[in-house]
Amino acid sequence: MKIRPLHDRVIVKRKEIEAKSAGGIVLTGSAAGKSTRGEVLAVGRGRILENGEVKALDVKVGDIVIFNDGYGVKVEKIDNDEVLIMSESDILAIVEK
């Protein structure tokens, strides 16, 4: 199945990150909490401004992004990956390499 986001929506695949406690113990499962990083899989055309113009999004396919846990709408697994649909404004930062 292929999903194409509309307007300023972005499709993000959660990326698992290794969580460690303050003492250096690797946390797993619910102790680690939900990842707030993900890879952008698809982007919409852009945000429609009040004057009708379309403002292109700052994020692009392949970007690794940071977002608040709880943002976005969880979609059934696509190609065995849990994906989220969210507005670009829900994304806090792009991780630069």
From Swiss-Prot:
Molecular function terms, GO-annotated: ATP binding; metal ion binding; protein folding chaperone; protein-folding chaperone binding; unfolded protein binding
Location of the protein in the cell: Cytoplasm
Keyword terms, alphabetized: Chaperone, Cytoplasm
GO cellular-component term (any): cytoplasm
Family annotation (PROSITE patterns): CHAPERONINS_CPN10
Signal peptide boundaries: none
GO biological process, one term: chaperone cofactor-dependent protein refolding
InterPro entries hit by this protein: Chaperonin_GroES, Chaperonin_GroES_sf, Chaprnonin_Cpn10_CS, GroES-like_sf
Its biological purpose: Together with the chaperonin GroEL, plays an essential role in assisting protein folding. The GroEL-GroES system forms a nano-cage that allows encapsulation of the non-native substrate proteins and provides a physical environment optimized to promote and accelerate protein folding. GroES binds to the apical surface of the GroEL ring, thereby capping the opening of the GroEL channel.
Listed NCBIfam families: PRK00364.1-1, PRK00364.1-2
Family classification: Belongs to the GroES chaperonin family.
Subunit field text: Heptamer of 7 subunits arranged in a ring. Interacts with the chaperonin GroEL.
Full protein name: Co-chaperonin GroES
Source taxonomy: Bacteria, Pseudomonadati, Pseudomonadota, Gammaproteobacteria, Enterobacterales
Gene behind the chain: groES
